[in-house]
């Protein structure tokens, strides 16, 4: 297993370095000819706040309520103009504003350290935060609204002859997604 940015995973799959990748599709892999995919998870988004933030006691938040906040932007890949970034910038536009992005990184730990240091807030998939119990100066509030989730896919090249991949995909196809 490798932990890479989504653009590195997509490139590795397209260059046949990987048989299968599990990723958020920030590069729009699903539109590539010869690539098949299956949704394996839908992760809800949460707002990471420092404990003293005025919104930290809320039970849920909408993207519209984040207008004017300094955003520590968790980008799914290293390129600053990816399909994934465009998708999320569109979500902000639909909420009626352009976000004030103070910092941009694909590194969850850096983002969370900056939130804890009260530098800003961040939107993250819940799989990045759901095991962080009693995190110092961090609070996670669900982001609500239609489409406020991240879809995780398994993607592979349809022409890949690896017999283990074929068996793995067959097994994957028999499982029910957890959402």
Where are these regions (language model features)?
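A local structural motif
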Residues: 1, 92-102, 137
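Central regulatory/effector-binding core of bacterial HTH transcription factors
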Residues: 1-30, 105
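General small-molecule cofactor/ligand-binding pocket signal
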Residues: 2-4, 38, 100-104, 141
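Short helices/loops that flank or line small-molecule/ion binding pockets
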Residues: 6-18, 89, 93-95, 108-119
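Secondary-structure junction motif
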Residues: 24, 63, 69-95, 162-165, ...
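Beta-alpha-beta core module
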Residues: 30-39, 43-44, 109-158
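Flexible hinge/capping segments at coil-to-helix
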Residues: 34-45, 49-71, 163-166
């Amino acid at each position: 297993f490798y932990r890479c940015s989504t653009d590195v995973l997509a490139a590795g799959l397209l260059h046949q370095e990987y048989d299968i990748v599990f990723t958020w599709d920030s590069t729009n892999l699903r539109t590539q000819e010869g690539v098949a995919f299956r949704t394996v998870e839908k992760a809800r988004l949460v707002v990471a706040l420092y404990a003293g933030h005025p919104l930290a006691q809320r039970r849920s938040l909408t993207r519209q309520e984040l207008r004017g906040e300094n955003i520590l932007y968790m980008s799914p890949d290293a390129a600053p103009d990816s399909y994934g970034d465009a998708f999320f910038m569109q979500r902000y536009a639909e909420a009626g504003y352009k976000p004030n992005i103070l910092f941009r990184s694909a590194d969850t730990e850096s983002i969370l350290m900056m939130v804890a240091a009260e530098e800003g807030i961040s939107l993250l998939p819940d799989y990045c935060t759901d095991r962080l119990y009693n995190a110092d100066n961090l609070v996670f509030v669900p982001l609500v609204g239609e489409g406020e989730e991240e879809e995780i896919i398994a993607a592979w090249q349809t022409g890949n002859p690896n017999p283990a991949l074929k068996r793995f995909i067959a097994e994957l196809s028999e499982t029910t997604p957890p959402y």
